Amino acid sequence: MGIQSSTMKLPLIHEISDYWHLLKPKIMYLVVLTGVTGIIIAPGNIHPLIAVISTLCIALGSGAAGAINMWYDSDIDALMTRTKTRPIPAGKISRSSALEVGLVLSFISVTIMMIAVNYISGILLAISIGFYIYVYTMYLKRRTPQNIVIGGAAGALPPIIGWTSVTGSISIESLVLFLIIFMWTPPHFWALSLLNYHEYEKAKIPMLPVTHGIFTTKIHILVYSILLFPITLLPGLFLKDPVLYEITAIPLGLMFVVQAFQVFKSSISYHYRVMFTYSIIYLFILFTCIMLSSF
């Protein structure tokens, strides 16, 4: 009896895992981190329950966008080694089910955010989801190498959403956090595109290395990384502990530029991978430090 029970549970566990991966959890983690940062550093008070609700809505909104993105991109995901094991191309979840999950989570997250938190946060969450789906996924991704640059605005909105959850308004401080993520996104994804250049080419996705070549992509990575550095110093102007922040942000940012320079002068994929991995660690540490420096 016990063996039968365990056997019956396994398919359910696998199904839950498949739907979880449909929501792009790795992206969700960073989205939640940046959203929570906005909540924590915003002036004023917020009830802990409202803060939790806002965070959950941001997470659900991110997952909703991820699910609909996988629904729309299932054809090209099936062509690339990096993405062909995703739930839809792997045959674990149907396209219709993925779309239903995405639409339901979009509605739930935006509605709850509007009712339980405030209208502006709900509207911004809806804009973030809509921009990622309609502007980036459905329009830009398959048409222009600037897909990541423009589309990055969707992923840069969570700290503003977190901020408005507390204050009910957008401020310069929240826009600085937006700008950091906006400038971080291109070099992060261009490093990934260098690693998967041939796969993007096979899937006919006009990533920068495919349309303009590897050398041009390296120049763009270096330029954006250099421009990102002074922008990341701006939070020191409004955080309560600017010294703690700057002594962390400066070496972090310099290392980011160093990694970008390594990518520029190297043709070894190892450096592309290091840049991609470091960029994730970089954003995690930077926003954690922003939160800690606000106390």
From Swiss-Prot:
InterPro entries linked to this entry: Protohaem_IX_farnesylTrfase (IPR006369), UbiA_prenyltransferase (IPR000537), UbiA_prenylTrfase_CS (IPR030470), UbiA_sf (IPR044878)
Presence of keyword Nuclease: no
Pathway note: Porphyrin-containing compound metabolism; heme O biosynthesis; heme O from protoheme: step 1/1
PROSITE patterns: UBIA
Disulfide links within the chain: none
Gene Ontology MF annotations: protoheme IX farnesyltransferase activity
Gene3D superfamilies for the chain: UbiA prenyltransferase
Catalytic activity: heme b + (2E,6E)-farnesyl diphosphate + H2O = Fe(II)-heme o + diphosphate
Residues that span the membrane, as ranges: 30-50, 51-71, 93-115, 119-136, 148-168, 175-195, 219-239, 244-264, 275-295
Function comment: Converts heme B (protoheme IX) to heme O by substitution of the vinyl group on carbon 2 of heme B porphyrin ring with a hydroxyethyl farnesyl side group.
UniProt-recorded name of the protein: Protoheme IX farnesyltransferase
The species this protein was found in: Ehrlichia ruminantium (strain Welgevonden)
Lineage, highest ranks first: Bacteria, Pseudomonadati, Pseudomonadota, Alphaproteobacteria, Rickettsiales
